[in-house]
């Protein structure tokens, strides 16, 4: 996608915003803006807020690079706004973004595609704190928040139900705990890049994802070819059944003792992190793309109505 007279497009870097993941979004936006400038693009950094429409009208960008995370940025809201303004934007569109953000509905889509998922129920927060709504071990998380914010693990020997924070919504997802290795695959367009094995001291939480040294990434994962092929296939099918575009990242758990039957899909992230410790840029680099080239590819892939 080119700007006026065949020049590189002018890019508005949408970052920050009001969600719980604001700080990660700011980090993502700064890194992507720096990388794009290194590729020759003019980039204007925009801290997305109530005056976003006025800011975009003033900037008149050719492309909006969506570096927002969490609510409003990856749930279809800002995508709908950009469609209304007719500004081509990166990453997934309105429907795919909204669907992926809603864990219950995205699981329903995965099931229709024959993808293996973990059993779960949606329950009232009050009920979850009063009793075990499913047998431990299980995980409690918001149905529509990302980056493992507010996730609770209830272990098998736990007698008392979890006491959830005030930040947790009135309705939460209670999901059977999936044992095994945490792995992830980035899809770029119609290509699954590689499998990363994520090694941490415990649950892959918000700190492990975004803090330097919070986790160790092994790529390609040291797993049998059969499992790697399944991860690639499942990630690509998840990307397609949700209707994603640009890049997405799908997370898995694999219980080695059960072989191929032990691989389950956890969720797909339509706005994967783009920070120095992020998984998708590492996978792109593994297949020969620099961070700057990955960001430039996203800009060239930007569009409306798909």
Curated annotation (Swiss-Prot):
Cofactor(s) essential for the protein: Mg(2+); Mn(2+)
Keywords on record: ATP-binding, Cell shape, Cell wall biogenesis/degradation, Cytoplasm, Ligase, Magnesium, Manganese, Metal-binding, Nucleotide-binding, Peptidoglycan synthesis
Keyword Manganese: yes
Subcellular location: Cytoplasm
Reactions catalysed: 2 D-alanine + ATP = D-alanyl-D-alanine + ADP + phosphate + H(+)
SUPFAM superfamilies in the record: Glutathione synthetase ATP-binding domain-like (SSF56059), PreATP-grasp domain (SSF52440)
Binding site for ATP: 134-184
Its EC number(s): 6.3.2.4
Protein name: D-alanine--D-alanine ligase
């Amino acid at each position: 996608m080119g700007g006026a007279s065949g020049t590189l497009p002018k890019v508005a870097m949408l970052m920050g915003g009001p969600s719980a993941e604001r700080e990660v979004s700011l980090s993502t936006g700064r890194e992507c803006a720096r990388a794009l400038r290194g590729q020759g693009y003019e980039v204007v950094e925009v801290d997305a807020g109530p005056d976003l429409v006025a800011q975009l009208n003033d900037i008149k960008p050719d492309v909006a690079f969506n570096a927002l995370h969490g609510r409003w940025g990856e749930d279809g809201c800002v995508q709908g706004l950009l469609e209304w303004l007719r500004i081509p934007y990166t990453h997934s569109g309105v429907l795919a973004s909204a669907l992926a953000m809603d864990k219950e509905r995205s699981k329903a889509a995965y099931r229709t595609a024959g993808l293996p998922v973990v059993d779960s129920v949606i329950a009232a927060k009050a009920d979850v704190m009063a009793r075990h709504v499913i047998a431990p071990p299980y995980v409690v998380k918001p149905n529509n928040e990302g980056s493992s914010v507010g996730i609770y693990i209830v272990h098998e020997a736990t007698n008392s139900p979890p006491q959830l924070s005030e930040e947790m919504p009135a309705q939460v997802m209670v999901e059977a705990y999936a044992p095994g290795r945490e792995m992830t695959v980035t899809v770029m367009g119609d290509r699954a890049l590689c499998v990363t094995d994520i090694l941490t001291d415990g649950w892959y939480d918000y700190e492990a994802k975004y803090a330097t040294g919070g986790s160790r990434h092994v790529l390609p994962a040291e797993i049998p070819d059969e499992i790697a092929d399944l991860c690639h296939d499942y990630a690509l099918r998840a990307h397609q059944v949700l209707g994603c575009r640009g890049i997405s990242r799908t997370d898995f758990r694999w219980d080695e003792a059960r072989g191929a039957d032990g691989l389950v899909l956890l969720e797909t992230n339509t706005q994967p992190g783009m920070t120095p410790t992020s998984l998708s840029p590492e996978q792109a680099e593994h297949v020969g793309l620099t961070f700057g080239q990955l960001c430039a590819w996203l800009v060239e892939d930007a569009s409306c109505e798909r």
